[in-house]
Regions:
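Conserved nucleotide-binding/hydrolysis micro-motifs of P-loop NTPases
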Residues: 61-63, 98, 123-125, 143-146, ...
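Conserved helicase/translocase motor-coupling segment
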Residues: 1-73
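Conserved helicase ATPase core of P-loop NTP-dependent helicases/translocases
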Residues: 84-121
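Short helix-terminating capping/connector loops at secondary-structure junctions
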Residues: 47-52, 85-88, 164-171
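Conserved helicase motor "Helicase C" RecA-like lobe of SF1/SF2 P-loop NTPases
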Residues: 60-94
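A conserved SF2-helicase RecA2
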Residues: 147-203
Length: 203
């Protein structure tokens, strides 16, 4: 059982970015970080006039102060260096060490001065009312429970989203990144089976 957990952990990390397993691996134009940065930049520029905002979720590779490398910071680097997005407009919820700091970031998202907010399910999936300008939600990984995925999407897909209502047909795009023949496929199927079972119980 312990070996299975270790193998699963490695498989999750490998699907996200090989550098999480071994820092010796080099960046790759076809990894999740590269694809995600490109998609974020597309939405950023598409909704520049409206100051549209985006949420980016991942429970792996989260920002840790003082850490040499993490997926959040890598995508932020790409956004700044490759796509010209100002670094101060990209924030990590883990940077907020107080409720006051957290509220300031949420207010900045609603104001459009922060345009991209990264976070994990536990830290960003609930209690964040920053939906006012949300145009896209990105999932770098998928949680194990359907309810967690719903909570993530609920940061933008909810009442009070003015930009989606006025400029995007009252829709928020949800982008899920996956690697073929990886643990991602297994997790998607598992989520689908769980959601189907839950729906059958409710009906």
């Amino acid at each position: 059982k312990a070996k299975m957990l270790i193998a699963t952990d490695y498989a999750r990390k490998m699907a996200l970015d090989m550098r999480m397993v071994d820092p010796a691996y080099e960046d790759h134009p076809d990894n999740k970080a590269s694809h995600c940065a490109r998609m974020i930049a597309e939405y950023y520029h598409k909704y520049e006039t409206q100051k549209g905002t985006q949420f980016v979720f991942s429970d792996l590779g989260t920002y840790q102060p003082g850490e040499n490398w993490n997926v959040y910071s890598e995508i932020k680097r790409k956004l700044s260096e490759d796509y010209g997005i100002p670094a101060h407009e990209v924030r990590f919820i883990q940077e907020c060490k107080s409720e006051k700091a957290r509220k300031a970031v949420i207010d900045a998202m609603n104001a459009g001065t922060v345009r991209v907010l990264f976070g994990s399910t536990s830290m960003l999936g609930t209690g964040v009312n920053a939906q006012k300008r949300c145009v896209a939600i990105h999932h770098l990984d998928t949680p194990w429970r359907p309810s967690d995925l719903e909570q993530r999407d609920g940061r933008g897909v909810r009442a009070g989203n003015e930009i989606a209502k006025l400029y995007a047909g009252n829709k928020v795009d949800v982008v899920i990144y996956a690697v073929e023949k990886s643990l991602d496929s297994y997790k998607f199927n598992l989520l689908h089976c769980k959601q189907t079972f839950i729906s059958q119980l409710k009906s």
